[in-house]
């Protein structure tokens, strides 16, 4: 399925049913009085977050949603049936904005979250409700009010704990394939990854975290070059970034330090708080270098970047160093959760 992270939809809530003008007519009761019932309320439209969806692509083919209209009231004080609500399922992580006014309506960050986006119309009142001591036979009823109608802009920001950054062909897709059940395309050319991928990384029997892989960044990405910048927003919800660097980039011939600096520069230019997130350096493809060259190459990259945060040496293809990396990531995330819980208390 094609990955789509923005869509526009139209939602129409149901109108309220009209109140009824009716009078009781029975044998031997010539003046039965008013018995017109109220109408039913119109159905409302809700968005519901679901972990079973990961794209907004379906809304390209079905973009207009309507809730049911309330039924009109009838005689014998019968109230009209309320219209059924309309529930629209969207991926968890969807941000909802009124396309006409720009109003931020909500952010569906947890599976099962429900957001009211169009309220159904209020029911009309039947003439039985207007009877009084001075008006025994009212010939008055009110119509139902119209339901709300909106055009909504939906934007999906994937929810992941850890995000992967790096130049094209740095091995990000190989890494997420190696540590999770995600199966992004892997090939020996740039921009193999064309859209974000999510994978659940399991550490032990009971613990896990979600990892996101986005297309590689190139110089000028913040101004629109390449593919990665349009997907950087999917990393804004992450708690940790792993900067993957190819330590033996024989295909591109780009010095690893230069490549890493370009990614960092694009991250800072794009902004939105990504440059402030915790970031670990992951030196990939260590299986390609002889042991005596590996140490000097790693030291050259670390010194060239003036890197003081954690550094990991891995081979995503061979599986080297992955166990330590995933366990340390899990430990870091758990420490963050405990710190967050303590601050809330």
Swiss-Prot record:
A GO MF term: GTP binding
Biological process (GO) annotations held by this record are: ribosome biogenesis
The taxonomic lineage of its organism, from the top, reads:
Bacteria, Pseudomonadati, Pseudomonadota, Gammaproteobacteria, Methylococcales
Family to which the UniProt record says this protein belongs: Belongs to the TRAFAC class OBG-HflX-like GTPase superfamily. OBG GTPase family.
Instruction: Name its species.
Output: Methylococcus capsulatus (strain ATCC 33009 / NCIMB 11132 / Bath)
PROSITE patterns this protein is in? G_OBG (PS51710), GTP1_OBG (PS00905), OBG (PS51883)
Which positions in this protein are listed as binding Mg(2+)?
Answer: 173, 193
Which cofactor does the UniProt annotation name? Mg(2+)
Whether Cytoplasm counts among this entry's keywords is yes
Q: Which top-level group of life is the source organism from?
A: Bacteria
Q: Where is the OBG-type G domain?
A: 160-334
Q: How does it assemble?
A: Monomer.
Query: Which class of enzymes does this protein belong to?
Result: hydrolase
The listed locations are: Cytoplasm
Question: What InterPro entries does the entry give?
Answer: G_OBG, GTP-bd, GTP-bd_Obg/CgtA, GTP1-OBG_CS, GTP1_OBG_dom, GTP1_OBG_dom_sf, OBG_GTPase, P-loop_NTPase
- Positions that bind GTP: 166-173, 191-195, 213-216, 284-287, 315-317
Domain Obg, chain residue ranges per copy: 1-159
Identify the SUPFAM superfamilies for this entry: Obg GTP-binding protein N-terminal domain (SSF82051), P-loop containing nucleoside triphosphate hydrolases (SSF52540)
Report the EC code(s) recorded for this entry. 3.6.5.-
The name this protein goes by in its record: GTPase Obg
| Keywords (A to Z) from UniProt | Cytoplasm, GTP-binding, Hydrolase, Magnesium, Metal-binding, Nucleotide-binding
């Amino acid at each position: 399925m094609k990955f789509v992270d923005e869509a526009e939809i139209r939602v129409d809530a149901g109108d309220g049913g009209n109140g009824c003008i009716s009078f009781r007519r029975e044998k031997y009761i010539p003046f039965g009085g008013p018995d017109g019932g109220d109408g039913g309320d119109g159905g409302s439209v809700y968005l519901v977050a679901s972990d079973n969806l990961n794209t907004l692509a379906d809304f390209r083919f079905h973009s207009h949603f309507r809730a049911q209209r309330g039924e009109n009231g009838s005689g014998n004080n019968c109230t009209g049936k309320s219209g059924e609500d309309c529930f629209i399922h969207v991926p968890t992580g969807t941000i909802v904005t009124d396309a006409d006014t720009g109003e931020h309506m909500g952010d569906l960050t947890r599976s099962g979250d429900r957001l009211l986006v169009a309220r159904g119309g209020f029911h009309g009142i039947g003439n039985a409700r207007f009877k009084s001591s001075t008006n025994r036979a009212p010939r008055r009823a009110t119509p139902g009010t119209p339901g709300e109608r909106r055009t909504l802009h939906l934007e999906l920001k994937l929810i992941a704990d850890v995000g992967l950054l790096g130049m094209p062909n740095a091995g990000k897709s190989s890494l997420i394939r190696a540590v999770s059940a995600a199966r992004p395309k892997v090939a020996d050319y740039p921009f193999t990854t064309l859209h974000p991928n999510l994978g659940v990384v399991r550490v032990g029997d009971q613990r896990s975290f979600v990892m996101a892989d986005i297309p590689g960044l190139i110089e000028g990405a913040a101004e629109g070059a390449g593919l990665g910048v349009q997907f950087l927003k999917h990393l804004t919800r992450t708690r940790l970034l792993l900067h993957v660097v190819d330590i033996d980039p024989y295909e591109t011939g780009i010095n690893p330090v230069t490549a890493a600096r370009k990614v960092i520069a694009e991250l800072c230019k794009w902004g939105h708080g990504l440059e402030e997130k915790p970031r670990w350096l992951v030196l990939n493809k260590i299986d390609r270098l002889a042991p005596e060259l590996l140490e000097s190459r790693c030291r050259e990259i670390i010194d060239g970047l003036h890197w003081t945060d954690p550094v990991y040496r891995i081979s995503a293809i061979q599986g080297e160093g992955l166990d330590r990396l995933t366990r340390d990531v899990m430990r870091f995330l758990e420490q963050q959760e405990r710190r967050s819980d303590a601050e809330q208390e």
